């Protein structure tokens, strides 16, 4: 029964579809004659409409106007459909002759059906085209490249404009990005480019300026471009984005255009807008400004031009221009005060303009003193600062989508003005503050920290500093913006008190200690800290770098139960901690490095939440007894302190089951062996200094290092060792897996029995290598050890190319050294080799292809006779490196 029902349904469906198909086919054939007549009538109407439109267009063009693009597109479509109509009409007689049975059938059903369908569809298309042919406006004034208003060229900006212009004129450049912090002058530079195009033309048909801003809307950009191209009216406005894109594409494809996009915050999809590709052949250009390097990359610009702040001299010239010579000369002291005010702007044109204009009418010296005071203490209160400067810079802060990234940015404002901040220190703070989840593991957390720093650098909120970019710096005006956001835009100034580097001698008075969440008094001259402030909300306390600080009273810490970060480092006179530090029950970060503290209070063991403890460079600290009670500890710094580790100390360290990072000095073979036996400790070591290892006569003087995955820095000094081996490996095992993957710095001094350092093959990421006073060292990498294995093992060794990341190689007082490596190496990152008192080193592992093209390289030496004795691989190598050699006095 079920099968019969199914069959019935299937038959019904087949019949229905067959009927529908036959009905459609019949209509196309049966009504063919009528449809041809209807099509002829529709074409006649369309032609009449076209003639009317053309007549109007010709009249307007006679007045000097230019037909609208939408009119031109419509006329083009009319011509296309008319041509298609005449092609279709040419087959009319043949198709009509095929009709039979009173036009109900055809002698060629397939041909008649196809022809009839084309006629029917063309009627609809012609009627639709005709209905769209009624334009309110058919022509408008031709678009002109109008000058954009701009201030006179700022002193010092001529060079970057010329660079930008030269790059724009390069036929190989299609898209150019200008990036920099807010207020630095990107829009001004783009305006200069626009106006220069107006003056010079340079064969450009049209220049289009669009302000994009943070609220990116494709349809808004299309409207701005469409208006410039003559696409206006209701019909254009009603079109979908994709239809507008086609119109823009068709129009711009016939022109040489320059599109200027100002202030973009995310990738602009040029294809969606309808912008043709920019090629060497069409010489079209797109130029944009942004505050983000990420945006440059997403726009396909991998070599953008940075617009930087003005130099000190150029900034002063701009500031003088804004203030005027009458005000500057109205009192003898004003000129010096004006230089201080200008200096607070740190070369940022936006700040120089706003503050300069504000001070233009100030002729009383007291007003200038007041300006310096306000800009030093709380710049947000300076007239015009919040609305015209900080608010503009705050857009960059608002564009940071993650709240933790915003908190990390604000944290940098706790440092003094123009201060270089170590990256690793910031990341340690952020982990302890909870901005980064420390539970994911130290390495992953640190990587996340570097990702956040990269985000802030690419957003032009921080800049990288130092040769190896290990530090960051915050522009002073950006810092003021960060402090402004920390104070809830000035509504709660005591929420975050920052008087870092202010020359304080004592803790400042605060009206409402209960509101304070972050307090930075670092880098001052505070001598004593006393009192008992009620700070129930305080989470961060920076007291480091108060080099005169001798004493902190116990009462000071009594009401800080939410304190998470306490930094007391580099208080060189501080000789003790109060017992009340145990009341900091939420403390996670404590830095006592570079202090004069002799002993840790026993109550320190009560800090059960502490995860980061830095005791490095505490020259008077004698013991870490009880350290094992800090059950949450993950990072412990002991390097360069006075602690003499013994067996009991190592046992205590071994009890720290959550320990991930350890920096330490090892001065005893017994302690070293004990730590090697406690393998988990070796895996935690990040920085290790091995000093004064002395072996008994019956002891093997080989140093067997275990694998240390976390090790980043290794220093060895004055050790009686004859050879360094990797404990897990010998030279006849597979060496292709690095044992010291993270090791980047190796310094070895006064180890007189070492003959080679072949173990360095297992440290592929070394960037800095210093070898000094190794009297018996003959080869850096031993040829015999590295090749004296089986053929299969040699093939494995050949996969290791040493020193691929090495940047600096320092060789000093190595009287027997003859070889660094037996063949030439590529050294792609090498920037310098320093050679002193290495008389037997005649050959260097260099050839004419060594080093990165364009990278600065210097070969420094102390003795002229040494460089004259060097045996270069060939003449090309000699010519390649001799210009880079430099005679210097190297201080060992």
Curated annotation (Swiss-Prot):
LRR repeats, residue ranges: 515-536, 537-559, 562-584, 586-608, 609-631, 632-654
SUPFAM superfamilies: L domain-like, P-loop containing nucleoside triphosphate hydrolases
InterPro entries per record: Apaf_helical, LRR_dom_sf, LRR_R13L4/SHOC2-like, NB-ARC, P-loop_NTPase, Plant_NBS-LRR, WH-like_DNA-bd_sf
Highest taxon, organism lineage: Eukaryota
Domain NB-ARC: 137-440
Coiled coil: 24-63
Biological process annotations from GO: defense response
Family membership: Belongs to the disease resistance NB-LRR family.
Function: Potential disease resistance protein.
Notes on the domains: The LRR repeats probably act as specificity determinant of pathogen recognition.
Protein name per its UniProtKB record: Putative disease resistance protein At4g10780
Species assigned in the record: Arabidopsis thaliana
Species lineage: Eukaryota, Viridiplantae, Streptophyta, Embryophyta, Tracheophyta
């Amino acid at each position: 029964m079920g099968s019969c029902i199914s069959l019935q349904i299937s038959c019904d469906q087949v019949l229905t579809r067959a009927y529908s198909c036959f009905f459609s086919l019949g209509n196309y054939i049966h009504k063919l004659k009528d449809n041809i007549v209807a099509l002829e009538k529709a074409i006649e109407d369309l032609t009449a409409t076209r003639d009317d439109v053309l007549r109007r267009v010709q009249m307007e063009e006679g007045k000097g106007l230019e037909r609208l693009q939408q009119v031109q597109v419509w006329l083009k479509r009319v011509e296309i459909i008319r041509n298609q109509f005449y092609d279709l009409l040419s087959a009319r007689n043949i198709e009509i002759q095929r009709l039979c049975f009173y036009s109900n059938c055809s002698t060629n059903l397939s041909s008649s059906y196809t022809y009839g369908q084309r006629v029917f569809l063309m009627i609809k298309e012609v009627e639709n085209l005709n209905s769209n042919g009624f334009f309110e406006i058919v022509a408008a004034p031709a678009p002109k490249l109008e000058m954009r208003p701009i201030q006179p060229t700022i002193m010092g900006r001529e060079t970057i404009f010329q660079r930008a212009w030269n790059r724009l004129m390069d036929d190989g450049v299609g898209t150019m990005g200008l990036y920099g912090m807010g207020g630095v002058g990107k829009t001004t530079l783009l305006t200069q480019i626009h106006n220069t195009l107006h003056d010079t033309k340079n064969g450009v048909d049209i220049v289009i300026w669009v302000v994009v801003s943070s609220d990116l809307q494709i349809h808004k950009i299309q409207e701005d471009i469409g208006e410039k191209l003559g696409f206006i009216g209701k019909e254009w406005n009603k079109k979908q984005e994709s239809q507008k894109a086609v119109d823009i594409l068709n129009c711009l494809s016939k022109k040489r255009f320059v599109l200027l996009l100002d202030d973009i915050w995310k990738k602009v999809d040029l294809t969606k807008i309808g912008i043709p590709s920019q090629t060497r052949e069409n010489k079209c250009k797109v130029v944009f400004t942004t505050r983000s390097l990420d945006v440059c990359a997403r726009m396909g610009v991998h070599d953008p031009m940075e617009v930087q702040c003005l130099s000190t001299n150029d900034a002063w010239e701009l500031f003088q221009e804004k203030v005027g010579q009458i005000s500057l000369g109205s009192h003898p002291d004003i000129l010096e005060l004006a230089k201080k005010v200008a200096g607070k702007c740190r070369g940022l044109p936006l700040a120089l303009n706003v503050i300069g204009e504000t001070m233009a009418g100030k002729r009383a010296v007291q007003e200038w003193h007041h300006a310096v005071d306000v800009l030093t203490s709380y710049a947000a209160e300076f007239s015009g600062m919040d609305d015209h400067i900080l608010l503009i810079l705050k857009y960059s802060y608002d564009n940071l989508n993650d709240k933790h990234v915003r908190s990390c940015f604000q944290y940098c404002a706790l440092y003094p003005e123009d201060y270089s901040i170590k990256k690793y220190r910031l990341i340690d703070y952020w982990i302890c503050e909870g901005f980064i989840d420390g539970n994911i593991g130290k390495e992953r957390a640190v990587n996340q920290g570097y990702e956040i720093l990269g985000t802030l650098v690419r957003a032009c909120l921080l800049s990288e500093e130092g040769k190896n970019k290990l530090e960051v710096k915050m522009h002073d005006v950006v810092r003021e913006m960060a402090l402004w956001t920390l104070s809830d835009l000035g509504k709660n100034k005591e929420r975050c008190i920052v008087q870092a580097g202010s020359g304080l001698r004592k803790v400042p008075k605060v009206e409402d200690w209960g509101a304070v969440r972050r307090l930075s008094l670092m880098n001052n001259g505070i001598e004593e800290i006393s009192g008992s402030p009620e700070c129930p909300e305080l989470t961060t306390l920076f007291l480091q770098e108060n080099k005169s600080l001798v004493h902190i009273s116990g009462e000071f810490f009594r009401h800080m139960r939410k304190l998470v970060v306490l930094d007391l480092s580099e208080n060189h006179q501080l000789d003790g901690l109060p017992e009340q530090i145990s009341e900091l029950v939420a403390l996670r970060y404590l830095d006592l490095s570079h202090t004069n503290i002799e002993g840790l209070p026993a109550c320190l063991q009560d800090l059960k939440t502490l995860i980061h403890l830095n005791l490095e460079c505490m020259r008077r600290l004698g013991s870490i007894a009880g350290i094992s009670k800090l059950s949450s500890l993950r990072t412990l710094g002991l390097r360069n302190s006075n602690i003499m580790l013994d067996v009991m100390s190592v046992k205590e360290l071994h009890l720290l089951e959550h320990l991930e990072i350890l920096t330490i000095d090892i001065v005893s073979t017994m302690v070293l062996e004990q730590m090697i036996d406690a393998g988990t400790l070796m895996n935690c070591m990040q920085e290790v200094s091995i000093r004064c290892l002395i072996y008994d006569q019956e002891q093997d003087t080989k140093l067997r290092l275990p694998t240390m995955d976390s090790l980043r820095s290794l220093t060895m000094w004055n050790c009686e060792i004859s050879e360094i081996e990797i404990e897990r490996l010998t030279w006849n095992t597979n060496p292709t897996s690095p044992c010291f993957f993270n090791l980047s710095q190796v310094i070895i001094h006064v180890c007189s029995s070492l003959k080679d350092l072949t173990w360095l093959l297992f440290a592929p990421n070394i960037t800095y290598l210093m070898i000094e006073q190794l009297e018996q060292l003959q080869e850096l990498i031993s040829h015999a050890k590295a090749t004296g294995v089986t053929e299969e093992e040699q093939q494995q060794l050949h996969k290791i190319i040493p020193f691929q990341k090495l940047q600096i190689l320092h060789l000093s007082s190595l009287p027997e050294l003859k070889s660094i490596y037996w063949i030439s190496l590529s050294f792609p990152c090498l920037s310098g080799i320093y050679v002193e008192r290495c008389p037997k080193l005649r050959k260097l592992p260099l050839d004419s292809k060594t080093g990165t093209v364009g990278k600065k390289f210097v070969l420094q030496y102390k003795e002229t006779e040494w460089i004259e004795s060097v045996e270069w691989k060939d003449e090309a190598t000699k010519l390649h490196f001799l210009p880079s050699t430099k005679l210097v006095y190297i201080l060992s």
